[in-house]
Curated annotation (Swiss-Prot):
It comes from Macaca fascicularis (Crab-eating macaque). This is Amyloid-beta precursor protein. Residues 194-207, 228-264 have a biased composition (Acidic residues). Pfam families: APP_amyloid, APP_Cu_bd, APP_E2, APP_N, Beta-APP, Kunitz_BPTI. The gene is APP. The record marks 197-198, 219-220, 671-672, 678-679, 687-688, 690-691, 711-714, 720-721, 739-740 as: Cleavage. The lineage of its organism: Eukaryota, Metazoa, Chordata, Craniata, Vertebrata.
Amino acid sequence: MLPGLALLLLAAWTARALEVPTDGNAGLLAEPQIAMFCGRLNMHMNVQNGKWDSDPSGTKTCIDTKEGILQYCQEVYPELQITNVVEANQPVTIQNWCKRGRKQCKTHPHFVIPYRCLVGEFVSDALLVPDKCKFLHQERMDVCETHLHWHTVAKETCSEKSTNLHDYGMLLPCGIDKFRGVEFVCCPLAEESDNVDSADAEEDDSDVWWGGADTDYADGSEDKVVEVAEEEEVAEVEEEEADDDEDDEDGDEVEEEAEEPYEEATERTTSIATTTTTTTESVEEVVREVCSEQAETGPCRAMISRWYFDVTEGKCAPFFYGGCGGNRNNFDTEEYCMAVCGSVMSQSLRKTTREPLTRDPVKLPTTAASTPDAVDKYLETPGDENEHAHFQKAKERLEAKHRERMSQVMREWEEAERQAKNLPKADKKAVIQHFQEKVESLEQEAANERQQLVETHMARVEAMLNDRRRLALENYITALQAVPPRPRHVFNMLKKYVRAEQKDRQHTLKHFEHVRMVDPKKAAQIRSQVMTHLRVIYERMNQSLSLLYNVPAVAEEIQDEVDELLQKEQNYSDDVLANMISEPRISYGNDALMPSLTETKTTVELLPVNGEFSLDDLQPWHSFGADSVPANTENEVEPVDARPAADRGLTTRPGSGLTNIKTEEISEVKMDAEFRHDSGYEVHHQKLVFFAEDVGSNKGAIIGLMVGGVVIATVIVITLVMLKKKQYTSIHHGVVEVDAAVTPEERHLSKMQQNGYENPTYKFFEQMQN
């Protein structure tokens, strides 16, 4: 029975194991991470809701060794197979740090670099390579170094190529937080990219930058209002290309829009990490400059033991590294520090004994200095065709100024804490509170400047859109009124006008979609304004297109081209809609299934316009007889098109319903869009729907259960058969069966013989014979 029970338990355990997904991160909303700040309980990322949680045991604080960090990852994530750890590339801001033994947690944030807890087999990070940037990698199988070492290698490699380090990731793990290589992306310097932007301003869409407050502030806290990183919006930049139609007598150019995807810009202003962009003539010069720098703790407040080269002493000395920022005179061990700086600096010191030192002062690896009027300079400059380039430069100047000011405050904070070590506890607390208020003040000031910058840019973009649309409409009307009108020229002007209206509508919808995601309350306030504007665009296009049929000869000749143009516009609108309402898939595994496009219900109906839109010389034309066309009864449309579904094709054939739409026939606009905002996951601000398992995982689990069920049933049947057979088997003890027909005397004699009795008569005759 025991072997059968063992098989039964083994089969049940196997079936249970088959239900567990093989992907270690499957079904997780966030990546497993831990963060430490000495004097506070450790924090770890809740992989189910994307929030930072305090240490579950209420006792663990900062850990000094990488082995201890790995063990702690395994403790806080027991259900995951944590195999390694690695430092994150960027610091984060975390609030609600708790002290040991206290129930109340502080709400003010701290800047720290978390550790990523790697699940399962190591997989290198997927790096995005922006335009004009290069992807590079380095591997050395004889080297096994830390994250910091490979970060330095990547940064120096980009500096040698006169570029900036954009992003990087580790390759080939060889120990705990140790690797044999690095992959990284180098991008052109700011000055070069500015020149490229200025030269290509006519080919790129103007973007609206929405600033970048750290979203990690908003982990459900109601004590601090945080500016959410906002997306860029596309503005209008048109491109003329030659019309290769041989029938166009005057050779007018046709405007073709260079459509580019809608970009996201979520720049974190709390990241004070600096980038070295110094180009050097030799490796020795680079090392000499690095080793001459003073030790910098950086803006973060961790206490990591590191080494730096002290030029005055001529040897390496220990210091505490905060975890982010700082400079490259920062080494893990004294041996590594001396290996890099010892020989080069000794040669440099020998040279200085023979000749005076004429080298320039050491340059701190911070970003380029910025003027204090970064925003004022942009605001004083009038808008022009290079609005995008001017806005980008103003944005970069503003961020550089903010980083410099934050770095200065952090250095002052560090110095104040060093001097306040011997002060009473109340004075220390006052110092900390003073600098916290100063940091918050700088953040608020930067947010206000960003908002002012964005509002100005938005106003200029809208003015540019209005001017181009007005000019396109005037050219279209002029072409229709020409004597005689030229059909090809009319079509070209109509095409430009439709593109201008399309850009206006696209700009409006994307702006509203952005506001809807980051601030539903504000979106509800501006909803009527947005829909009224869409209504005006719709009416204006209807009346402008109906004017085409005032000239029947022209309308009939270019009818096919007009239909194709409007169909293309409809397809483009559908694509924009799909991109707008499809929610992003956020998962570190294959369990997160987002709702399909058909499951996301967003209906928009048209608002009534107070008063009819009027334009000189524009009157709808009804001579083609619209009575034969069914009335438009549908009002629900996709939000990108902002027109009734039956009219979205915008066919302009006579009697299509385009020329006889009246204001009073259009019902009141309603917006049935669900304004979703999930504060639990602040990166995308949309409600995410996750299923327990995807289809592939369900199939695997079902197959495993079936196999396990068959094995269990087989074991049970075999066990029962064996038990039954054993129960009915005859038991023999060596007794000879006696025939029931014999007499009692013979039966008694047989029993006596079995017990050893021998007949004396038989024994006598046997002895006689012998």
